[in-house]
Amino acid sequence: MQIYKVGGAVRDRLLGRPVTDIDWVVVGASSDEMLARGYRPVGADFPVFLHPQSGEEYALARTERKSGRGYGGFTFHASPEVTLEEDLTRRDLTINAMAEDEQGRVIDPYGGQADLEARLLRHVSPAFAEDPLRVLRVARFAARYAGLGFRIAAETLALMRQLAESGELQALTPERSWKEISRALMEPNPEVFIQVLHDCGALAELIPEVEALFGVPQPAAHHPEIDTGVHVLSVLQQCARHRQPLSVRWACLLHDLGKGLTSEADWPRHIAHEARGVPLIDAVNQRFRVPRDCQELARLVGEYHTHAHRALELRPNTLLELLQSFDVYRRPQRFEEFVAASEMDARGRLGLEQRDYPQAAYLLGAAQAARAVSVKPLVEKGLKGAELGEALKRARLAALKAYKEERGKA
């Protein structure tokens, strides 16, 4: 029985990056032997065990064979006879197909160290094309390591195109797709993830609503980058630079979907694109069974982001309606995330990344002014029901009028 450290832990150590999760592979052992040593079984599809002391995962060396469509269409074989090299050959990229023995020696049968030096993301074998999930994984690794100069090997990108064209991506479960997408959006360069999916044809299969934005022009006066797809990439880049949470990044990815529906005759203007985009945002959210907080914010950002850009011009009653749309009195964080997403949208324009966005402070101040209105004096007057609601609305409107006047004097 031999135990090897494998995958990301080996890769990240060689890159000089922090090692967080450690995976182990066990060669020459059976499930019975693992149980006898106190390991606890946790694998549903293949033999994976938790170490009795550390709780880390130890998997028996295994091979896999394509037996159906999609990510789950594989038959696994684990036995003491499976070698380390056979186990490593089933992995996606050469940089993930390295192992380290108990003496710290690196076992590298597929050139992972050379590809690390060359900053190359390259597949291990033609079997790469059997698993559609690997398209998303490689795009995610590209987003993670773009800052280190990594690029995808041409032959690997060709296999990714082959997978996209095969229709296999449609066999991925919504949950598995969302897991990869959400992880990728939180990488240092999330825009690279979307760019790679666009380049290999996978974006058209997975999120055609975003794919449709590439090549759609916007007014150069407001968007020097012109191309709407390029704008979305720039907005995601700003999200990463400003360390925005997943909900904001997801909303920013989808905020301009309505522009993909504008007829060419109306280009480069996109009148009412916000309202047109809402059904598309809903469809994408449902397709991937996106968590509720991300769904809600994406929908609201899509519908109201131009309100944020025009915040300084909004009348107090329009501003009050905006705050009520976000239920800002009970859910202030959602409004704060909306403001953040709108600012990322404004900054995601070529040459305007550093421009001030006074709308952010203005909107947050307006929310604070409206939330500061207390219902207590109105209740003490004996108001209740609809009458109380109307009185509270008038008080909040008065507070916003005073706020706007005060800001106008500043």
From Swiss-Prot:
Alphabetical keyword list: ATP-binding, Hydrolase, Magnesium, Metal-binding, Multifunctional enzyme, Nickel, Nucleotide-binding, Nucleotidyltransferase, RNA repair, RNA-binding, Transferase, tRNA processing
Residues involved in ATP binding: G8, R11, R91, R137, R140
SUPFAM superfamilies: Nucleotidyltransferase, Poly A polymerase C-terminal region-like
EC number: 2.7.7.72, 3.1.3.-, 3.1.4.-
Residues annotated as binding CTP: G8, R11, R91, R137, R140
PROSITE patterns: HD (PS51831)
Alphabetical GO biological process terms: RNA repair; tRNA 3'-terminal CCA addition
GO molecular function: ATP binding; CCA tRNA nucleotidyltransferase activity; cyclic-nucleotide phosphodiesterase activity; magnesium ion binding; phosphatase activity; tRNA binding
Residues at which Mg(2+) binds: D21, D23
InterPro entries registered for this protein in UniProt: CCA_bact, HD/PDEase_dom, HD_domain, NT_sf, PolA_pol_head_dom, PolyA_RNA-bd, tRNA_CCA-adding_enzyme
Known cofactor(s): Mg(2+); Ni(2+)
Free-text domain note: Comprises two domains: an N-terminal domain containing the nucleotidyltransferase activity and a C-terminal HD domain associated with both phosphodiesterase and phosphatase activities.
Note: A single active site specifically recognizes both ATP and CTP and is responsible for their addition.
Family to which the UniProt record says this protein belongs: Belongs to the tRNA nucleotidyltransferase/poly(A) polymerase family. Bacterial CCA-adding enzyme type 1 subfamily.
Function: Catalyzes the addition and repair of the essential 3'-terminal CCA sequence in tRNAs without using a nucleic acid template. Adds these three nucleotides in the order of C, C, and A to the tRNA nucleotide-73, using CTP and ATP as substrates and producing inorganic pyrophosphate. tRNA 3'-terminal CCA addition is required both for tRNA processing and repair. Also involved in tRNA surveillance by mediating tandem CCA addition to generate a CCACCA at the 3' terminus of unstable tRNAs. While stable tRNAs receive only 3'-terminal CCA, unstable tRNAs are marked with CCACCA and rapidly degraded.
Oligomeric and partner information: Monomer. Can also form homodimers and oligomers.
Name this polypeptide is given: Multifunctional CCA protein
Organism: Pseudomonas aeruginosa (strain UCBPP-PA14)
Organism lineage string: Bacteria, Pseudomonadati, Pseudomonadota, Gammaproteobacteria, Pseudomonadales
